[in-house]
């Protein structure tokens, strides 16, 4: 194994991701940020300097478990203090498992501003993947707004709320087109793009040779959009999800929610004199964003040769049965670790939209999360009892709660309590969706857990009840770090609390997290080793450091 050392500077820069100039948060002058590539077992050291003039910054390494380095998870107020302007912070962690991962900002809505990039982990030197391919294409999906994240944050925190609306553009590797379409020739209402190919918004072309197999790695770091990926005339063989191998299956398209990643294999066995569309459309919300497009270019064809037929049609946004059918097909590959048969503790988390003092919030069991100024990891390690609410949040919601009608209760409050687990405890979480403020409306939410992979034991419609127990899959449930709950439905997951630290578990939709849609899990914090001083140089832990510089 080796050490991969990166020196990064984060700063705002002018950029035109969708042919309209805007400001993006870039790294070393790049957008998206540089790709990290390592082998399982390697150490990754990122020397991160904050060149933003007036904002702190952190970077979360999404899907990396951070065993032994919970301070390097990159979640502001949970694992570390934000890095102040002008300061440098050293992230140092091991990448344990091969897979398709990514990194992104985790302070305010900085992910939305463009602070993200890919993190690819190959098998350890000398080991091979369990499937063969001739070449590889890496695709990072995101969504883009013309409105700045500052304006979005202020709007979400205002009364009445000003919602951010749907994104202007879907970006493929940071590239999209807003005022024009590369598929205009099939639709006279669309303005054709006049692109030479060198522009920052020119599509990222997938170049392939005929009669070969390619692995396409697809990760979604969208702020809001649930996406659907398809390639004209080509079947996709799904082989990996969130860095874990799955039982391979063929599909014409995949749904991908924010925080998820997949690998699919394609075989370039179509007519070699043609090129084919790659289309990424929006699902699960009423779309107001054109699909993101690029070409699968069969070499030696010219890139200017457009496919004979229009791009594949994205499935209807509200065809939830189709989404469920795809999601339910994902199971663990043969030989994957199986979940413990019994749980020690089961927590029910009810997802509701509520109004608190006229502000629209998201809440879990009637608590809307507002992070404290002292990072939990330091507060818990050094027993700072005043740093956050010592009363744990509720583990159940009222049995008679009606998930089919808008919430009527006025009990919702802002809070920052923590769910605490014993080391080795087997924890079940039942995520329960419900109606929003508006009649007959429930949304899809992707939930992401830091510091762990979990087994997805099952999904269902309506309210979870004891009868569902027998339907849970203990035989071959997939291991994931992100899982979706469908409208008016529930999702059951199981994980082992075996990674000392404090870990966020939250909706991966950026505005929803901003509005309080998350919880905090802690386990075995007393077993956490030395935490770099700089990670805790704020809030209550800073005072301890000043008073006792040797060891807070």
UniProtKB/Swiss-Prot annotation:
Its EC number is 1.10.3.3. Residues 1-122, 134-300, 344-523 form the Plastocyanin-like domain. Glycans are attached at residues 92, 325, 440. It is found in: Secreted. Its cofactor is Cu cation. It holds the Pfam family Cu-oxidase_3. Dimer. This is L-ascorbate oxidase.
């Amino acid at each position: 194994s080796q050490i991969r050392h990166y020196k990064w500077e984060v700063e705002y820069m002018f950029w035109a991701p969708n042919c309209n100039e805007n400001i993006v948060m870039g790294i070393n002058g790049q957008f998206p940020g540089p790709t990290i590539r390592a082998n399982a077992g390697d150490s990754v050291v990122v020397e991160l300097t904050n060149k933003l003039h007036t904002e702190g910054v952190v970077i979360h390494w999404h899907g990396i478990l951070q065993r032994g380095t919970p301070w390097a998870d990159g979640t502001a107020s949970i694992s570390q203090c934000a890095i102040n302007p002008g300061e440098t912070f050293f992230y140092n962690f091991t990448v344990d498992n091969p897979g398709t991962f990514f990194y992104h900002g985790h302070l305010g809505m900085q992910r939305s501003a463009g602070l993200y990039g890919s993190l690819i982990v190959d098998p350890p030197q000398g080991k091979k993947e369990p499937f063969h391919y001739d070449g590889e294409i890496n695709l990072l999906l995101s969504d883009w707004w013309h409105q700045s994240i500052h304006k979005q944050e202020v709007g979400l925190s205002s009364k009445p709320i000003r919602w951010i609306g749907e994104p202007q553009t879907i970006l493929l590797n940071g590239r999209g087109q807003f005022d024009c379409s590369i598929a205009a020739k099939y639709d006279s209402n669309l303005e054709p793009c006049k692109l030479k190919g060198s522009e920052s918004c020119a599509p990222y072309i997938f170049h392939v040779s005929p009669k070969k197999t390619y692995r396409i790695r697809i990760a979604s770091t969208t702020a809001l959009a649930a996406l659907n990926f398809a390639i004209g005339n080509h079947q996709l063989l799904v082989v990996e999800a969130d860095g874990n191998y799955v039982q391979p299956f063929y599909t014409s398209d995949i749904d991908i929610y924010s925080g998820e990643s997949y690998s699919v294999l394609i075989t370039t066995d179509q007519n070699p004199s043609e090129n084919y569309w790659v289309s990424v459309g929006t699902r699960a919300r009423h779309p107001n964003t054109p699909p993101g497009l690029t070409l699968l270019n069969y070499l030696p064809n010219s890139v200017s040769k457009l496919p004979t037929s229009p791009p594949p049609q994205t499935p209807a946004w509200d065809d939830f049965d189709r989404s469920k059918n795809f999601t339910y097909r994902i199971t663990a590959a043969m030989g994957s670790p199986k979940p413990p048969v019994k749980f020690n503790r089961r927590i029910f988390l009810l997802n509701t939209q509520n109004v608190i003092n006229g502000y629209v919030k998201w809440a879990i069991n009637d608590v809307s999360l507002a992070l404290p100024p002292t990072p939990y990891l330091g507060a818990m390690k050094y027993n700072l009892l005043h740093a956050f609410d010592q009363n744990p949040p509720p583990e159940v919601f009222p049995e008679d709660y009606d998930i089919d009608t808008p919430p009527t209760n006025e009990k919702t409050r802002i809070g920052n309590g923590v769910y605490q687990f014993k080391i080795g405890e087997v924890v079940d979480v039942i995520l329960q969706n419900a109606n929003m403020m508006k009649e007959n409306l429930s949304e899809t939410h992707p939930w992401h857990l830091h510091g762990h992979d979990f087994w997805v034991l099952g999904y269902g419609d309506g309210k979870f009840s004891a009868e569902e127990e027998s339907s849970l899959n203990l035989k071959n449930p997939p291991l994931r770090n992100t899982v979706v709950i469908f409208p008016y439905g529930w999702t059951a997951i199981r994980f082992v609390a075996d990674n000392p630290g404090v870990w966020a578990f939250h909706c991966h939709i950026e505005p929803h997290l901003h509005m309080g849609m998350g919880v905090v899990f802690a386990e075995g914090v007393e077993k956490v080793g030395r935490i770099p001083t700089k990670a805790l140089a704020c809030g209550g832990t800073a005072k301890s450091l000043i008073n006792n510089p040797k060891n807070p």
